[in-house]
Amino acid sequence: CPAQSDENRIATPVFRMLGIDPIYGYDENKESENHPRLNGCFTMEPYWDCGKDREVMEWYFREYYENPSLAGSHATTGQENSFGWEGIADGYRLQLELAQKWMSEGKLTVETLGETGRRFRKAFRDTPPAALSALTDWSGNGIRSVWFSCRYWRGNLFLRDGVLFFRDLFVFDDRYRERYLETPCTAWSAIYDNLPVLDRRRCITPETNCAWSFAGTVDSISLAQDEAAGTLTVTVSAADGATWTLTFSEEGFSAQNAPELTLEFGSGNDPVAVNGNGLEFCHEGFPYAVRITQGS
């Protein structure tokens, strides 16, 4: 997870790879019926259907590089050698064509990952607030998705069928020790995680919902950023004509004039205690909390 202290910090930037789809790259198995024409990973990987589809890749570039992103947006292109040139050639050529076009228009910079890392480390001492969003939907389902992340937490605000809800909230704490720090992993697969507050991907079941949902029907959302302050503000337009806002920052998120928020945690991630100041959790023996500073 991102470091909060010098003691646990490493000097090497670590980047999200693959160029993930802000809508379908999370919970992809639960959303698969919404995009029957494409299969595989919902990323920019040129081997898979999305990565070689011109309409989808043009959408990726627009959503990644035209929407507010605070510290900046990045995506990687290319594929592991084991996939072979025959499998990636069409998608890779398409993505290079689009990258060349956007670069010639002054909308992005194309560089090696090493160059990106050196530039990032020079610009930032700590992991900065960043945003990634999709304000249109290439599948035509009308879904909207806003991701915010910083060194303390991440969250995903999701709009589908008029319902606005959080589908993901995680706390970052560099005091949380990963499982294999002192004990080797002997299983076929390994688990690396952070501290879940809301984990829809893992905890939703046919019987239990997993979402923090706002009441009422929402027509649309729009974004505004304050790069200097590191804040992202979501303006929500409701079907009844009301307008309200959510603001994301390193300290958390705040709502102004928002309707009631219903909390559903799904299966296996309930808070261990609820008190007047918020919610207390325990994951793998590590206690953590989400505090409410105003409201009830």
Question: Where are the regions a protein language model picked out?
Answer:
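Surface beta-strand/loop "capping" patches
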Residues: 120-159
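Substrate-binding cleft of secreted/luminal carbohydrate-active enzymes
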Residues: 54-120
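Broad, structure-driven detector of short, well-ordered beta-strand segments within folded domains
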Residues: 152-159, 242-250, 290
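Active-site-adjacent pocket scaffolds in enzyme catalytic domains
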Residues: 1-63
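Aromatic- and carboxylate-enriched substrate-binding clefts and catalytic-loop regions
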Residues: 1-16, 77-82, 105-131
